[in-house]
Amino acid sequence: MLHLQPQNLLIQKTLNEAIEALRKGSPLTMDRIVSDFDYTTYHISNTAEDKSILLLSVKTKAWVSVSECQLDGSLTLLKFLADHYSSLGGVTIPSEVEPGYDYTLQITLAELVQESILQLSVLKTIILSFPFELAISKFIELSQQQPAPVEAEITGGEVAANGDNTLFTIKYRDEENIFIKPSNDRVTIIFETIFQDETDKIFGKVFLQEFVDARKRNRQIQSAPQVLYSHEPPLELKRLYQPPKVAEQSRRFITFVLFPRHFQTKELQFHSICQLTLFRNYFHYHIKCSKAYMHSRMRFRVDSFIKVLNRAKVDEDDENDELSAEGRQQARRTFTGRKIVY
């Protein structure tokens, strides 16, 4: 299976090209549009006056819903991004955002380092990680108020844990959302997805069942998050979200249950968030790959059957000779086209 990487390779390539051109004394005039998953667009540009300064702007469908996520009002999305990027070498935050985009960063090529390039290439993931960070903070608060029983994490119960009505929603696609529900012993991530046809539903169900079975078979991944698949909203959502009637028959809910072991450290926390933000793309990509593989196999079988039928055809000259020979026993052939000898 293909594991998608969170970084945008086109951004990395563009920035490295700009740095190399600046070192050679011939800086590039930059005006590039770079696309990413989930209706995300980047714009990398500079001005003719100073080509060593780049602007990286991003526009994503999830921006409005993510910026609305609040915990206690002390941390906003803009402050979260400023804290993350202001400490990087060669990256500053301009006072104005480029028109038509949601967020803009200013890049000084002469001071840019590889770590800054890597962080710039995951800008979309950093934006989407904001509600996850809030949910983990809320989990810590709830767990201190009401510690979870030890057996809750061991059994991985499917019933909603104790908590309040805090729910973070990421509206990142048309009619598809990500719901993040913190509680006192876990953080529940719920993906709302829509399948295009019945075939996608079948492949999706088989694909997710393999997630469950592989977790049971392999001891090395038994500590992975629990995966649940349902037609109806899970218990965590029933009182807080009412799905629209549009595409009701094609709507499904995929639930991941994260326990403290999945976000103990900052590195592990970011790795888990990256995997979750890319799950929908990973999931539907492999559904399409499975359908393409099935179609190629069917085409191969049809081609092999056509070859068999072509070999079974009777040549016109042979057929005339057999008909003109008076009294000759009519020749019979097998399905491969060979004559039967008596």
From Swiss-Prot:
Localization in the cell: Cytoplasm, Cytoskeleton, Actin patch
Cited InterPro entries: ARPC2, ARPC2/4
Highest rank taxon of the organism: Eukaryota
Gene Ontology annotations for the cellular component aspect, listed alphabetically: actin cortical patch; actin cytoskeleton; Arp2/3 protein complex
Principal place of residence: cytoplasm
PTM annotation (Phosphoserine): residues: 324
Disulphide bond pairs: none
GO biological process per UniProt: actin cortical patch organization; actin cytoskeleton organization; actin filament polymerization; actin nucleation; Arp2/3 complex-mediated actin nucleation; microtubule cytoskeleton organization; protein localization to cell cortex; receptor-mediated endocytosis
GO molecular function: actin filament binding; calmodulin binding; molecular adaptor activity; structural constituent of cytoskeleton
Modification type Phosphothreonine: residues: 155
Keyword tags: Actin-binding, Cytoplasm, Cytoskeleton, Phosphoprotein
Subunit record text: Component of the Arp2/3 complex composed of ARP2, ARP3, ARC40/p41-ARC, ARC35/p34-ARC, ARC18/p21-ARC, ARC19/p20-ARC and ARC16/p16-ARC.
Function of the molecule: Functions as actin-binding component of the Arp2/3 complex which is involved in regulation of actin polymerization and together with an activating nucleation-promoting factor (NPF) mediates the formation of branched actin networks. Seems to contact the mother actin filament.
Entry's family note: Belongs to the ARPC2 family.
Designated name of the protein: Actin-related protein 2/3 complex subunit 2
Lineage: Eukaryota, Fungi, Dikarya, Ascomycota, Saccharomycotina
GN (gene name): ARC35
